[in-house]
Structures are given as structure tokens and as C-alpha cells.
Amino acid sequence: MSVELIREYWAYHHWANRRLFDVVTALGEPAAGREVGKQFSEPTPRAMLVHMYGADRFWLETWQGRPPAVVRGDPTYGLDIRTLDDLRRRWDALEAEQRGYLTDLVEIDLWKPVDGATPEGKIFSRPLGMLLLHVPTHAAHHRSELCTMLTMVKVGS
């Protein structure tokens, strides 16, 4: 694990998120809000994007030592984001913060422990580098769900 690897992985994470966000935006707000099934982590494409944004926000604030402003354990992190424009504005600001955080990383930071608790109260301690790899991996799962959702929305329209 290296800072260079982490930065490259996050560059891909940001690129892939933006690509899918652009597809959802091109389909429009009605499609973004269309429920496509309970088999997904979130019921609508917009809710899936909000979940992904919320997870990124939660972890950045945790790594910065700030109490997260989002509600952990709620799939959309307690966020009330009703439009793609609102989400894009927030996500752009978050990406800028993430890039700044990643720019300041040095190799030794990757091994610093991050302590916390799951929504169920289970205590954990993991090296920062492992958590920096976890977040884009978490998003990859949801991006794959979102691709299937978008196929269903497009076919169902």
C-alpha cells in the first residue's frame, strides 16, 4: 500500500462516480426518483447516489477527526437531498475536500489507526490506508447496482 496507489484509486473513484452521475442526470429527475425494486441497497438511482455521497462524507469527516455531520445507520445518512443539482453541488465540494486531504497524505499516515464504532455499536480499529481503500470499494459495489438500476429505468421508460 502506498500514497500513490491510494491517490490513483481515488482518482478512479471520482471519475467513475461522475460518469454515472452524468448518466443519471441525462435521464432526468423523474427517472432518478423512480423506484426500481427492493433488491437494491436503495430504491431509486438518486437515493443510491445520496448513499454513496453520504458514505464518502462520513468517512472523510471521521478521518479528519470531526464528528460526522451525517447520520450513520440510515442508508441515506439522514440527508435530505431532493434534486440532482443539490447533490452535484454538495458532491463537488466534497470531492475538493477529499482531493485536498489526499494531497496532504504521507506514507506514515496510512498506518495510523482510526478507531470508531459501527452503527450496531461494534468497536473497530483499522489503519487509515485500509479505510482509504474501503471507501472506493464500497462505492464500486453501489456503482454496479446503479448500472443495473439504470438499465431497468431506461427499459421501463
PLM-predicted stretches and their roles:
Residues M1-E4:
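Basic/polar N-terminal segments that are highly enriched at the extreme N-terminus
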Residues I6, N17, L84, W91-E95, ...:
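A structural signal for well-ordered alpha-helical scaffolds and beta->alpha junctions
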Residues R7-T76, T118-S157:
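Short, contiguous alpha-helical
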Residues R66-L110:
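Helix-adjacent hinge/juxtasegments
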Residues E107-E120:
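Carboxylate-rich helix-loop segments that flank metal/cofactor sites and access channels
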